[in-house]
Amino acid sequence: MQDFKSLGLSRWLVESLNAMRITHPTAIQKHCIPEILKGRDCIGGAKTGSGKTIAFAGPMLSQWSDDPSGMFGVVLTPTRELAIQIAEQFTALGSSMNIRVCLVVGGESIVKQALELQKKPHFIIATPGRLAHHILSSGEEVVGGLSRVKYLVLDEADLILTQTFAADLSTCIAKLPPKQKRQTLLFTATITDQVRALQNAPAQDSKPPLFAYEVENVDNVAVPSTLKLEYLLVPEHVKEAYLYQLLTCEDYKDSSVIVFVNRTTAAEVLRRTLRSLEVRVASLHSQMPQSERINSLQRFRANAARVLIATDVAARGLDIPTVELVINYDIPQDPDTFIHRSGRTARAGRSGDAISFVTPRDVSRIEAIEERINKKMDECKKVHDTAVIRKALTKVTKAKRESLMDMEKANFGEKRKTQKKKNLAEKSLRA
């Protein structure tokens, strides 16, 4: 069986991995690490929980340690939470070598980040929007080092290459060395047309050919065999009661659960409702201050909260290994979003369940999802007793009504408007 030393990683890094009890490389690591060390650009496709971060961090850290000075690599990722997670992994792996990692994400002090960038950190882990903001508004003494980096990584590349990030990504890439003078690594759980277009681009004379590797074909990547997919037919007006019954039924009363919703207001209503019903719950959505988002994740990871109500900021790449159940309370419009949500459970060979609440208006979305994953969902039989639903309905309805009143008193809607204005102001600064 191969080990990390045989892949070509530096001895100090192999020792760091061993200290973290990471001794045997996964498929994506075995194939990508040696090729990246040869200087090749790389596209890596593998399901979440398969070790993609070490597949790119390993060779980057190994080569950096040969000449540990200045800005060496930039990792761009679509969400703050994923950026924080990657920064933690770089810091842990490089701790014995006095590595300097700078986290550049929204929700944190721009001034503090600029001061850190000025000190020329070795690795910058960033969301495209915040790094673009620094490039456009900070002086050369802050961002000048970016023009000499050796690596650019796009993690969750399928999302970063969408129109949502296009302008910010262009700003970031324009500041980096040209592609002939840096290595570019793309990692994703979903190989989209945009990613394949890069894979099929003409080779560059001055560089070795691009290396592309998918652990399995895309449909297997999308849905692990250990993931059990079910649907529950639910009338729209009693969704909260069904959710409460499912969370407290015999099968799931002690389980670690992520409940996905499409809107921040729904996340807040459910969090407050379940909390008043004495469910240990936390939430994660874009209207929360960054400190609260981090606190929610820490509580969920530590099992202080067993239920996390989340919008899709949590669906991407987050490593929460113990999640046993994902509930799609609202069905997403994009089937790939469903895949990423469901990928929060059944990670790294573990089993897991994903249950989707289906109202009459969701049927076409479910059909599109089933076509995308080439698999039919089974009907969930765990909550079917109408009498039990009715019994819970009064209690849940009362809790929801009180939650809505509390949100009104707390001016939740006004806070959302203020946050939206703030986000728009930041975008206009980068326009």
Curated annotation (Swiss-Prot):
Coiled-coil intervals: none
The record's section on Gene3D superfamilies has: P-loop containing nucleotide triphosphate hydrolases
GO molecular-function term, one example from the UniProt record: ATP hydrolysis activity
Q: Which CDD domains match?
A: DEADc_DDX49 (cd17955), SF2_C_DEAD (cd18787)
Q: Where is this motif: Q motif?
A: 2-30
The kind of enzyme this is, by top-level EC class, is hydrolase
Domain Helicase ATP-binding, by residue range, is 33-209
Q: Which GO terms describe its biological process?
A: endonucleolytic cleavage in 5'-ETS of tricistronic rRNA transcript (SSU-rRNA, 5.8S rRNA, LSU-rRNA); endonucleolytic cleavage in ITS1 to separate SSU-rRNA from 5.8S rRNA and LSU-rRNA from tricistronic rRNA transcript (SSU-rRNA, 5.8S rRNA, LSU-rRNA); endonucleolytic cleavage to generate mature 5'-end of SSU-rRNA from (SSU-rRNA, 5.8S rRNA, LSU-rRNA)
Residues given in the record as ATP binding sites? A46, K47, T48, G49, S50, G51, K52, T53
Comp. bias (Basic and acidic residues): 406-416
One Pfam family per UniProt:
DEAD
Superkingdom, natural source = Eukaryota
Q: Which InterPro entries match?
A: DEAD/DEAH_box_helicase_dom (IPR011545), DEAD_box_RNA_helicase (IPR050079), Helicase_ATP-bd (IPR014001), Helicase_C-like (IPR001650), P-loop_NTPase (IPR027417), RNA_helicase_DEAD_Q_motif (IPR014014)
Which transformation does this protein catalyse, written as a reaction? Answer: ATP + H2O = ADP + phosphate + H(+)
Q: Disordered: where is this region?
A: 406-431
The domain section of the record reads:
The Q motif is unique to and characteristic of the DEAD box family of RNA helicases and controls ATP binding and hydrolysis.
Sum up the protein's function in the record's words: ATP-binding RNA helicase involved in 40S ribosomal subunit biogenesis and is required for the normal formation of 18S rRNAs through pre-rRNA processing at A0, A1 and A2 sites. Required for vegetative growth.
Task: Give the protein name, as stated in the record.
Answer: ATP-dependent RNA helicase DBP8
Organismal lineage: Eukaryota, Fungi, Dikarya, Ascomycota, Saccharomycotina
Instruction: Give the gene symbol.
Output: DBP8
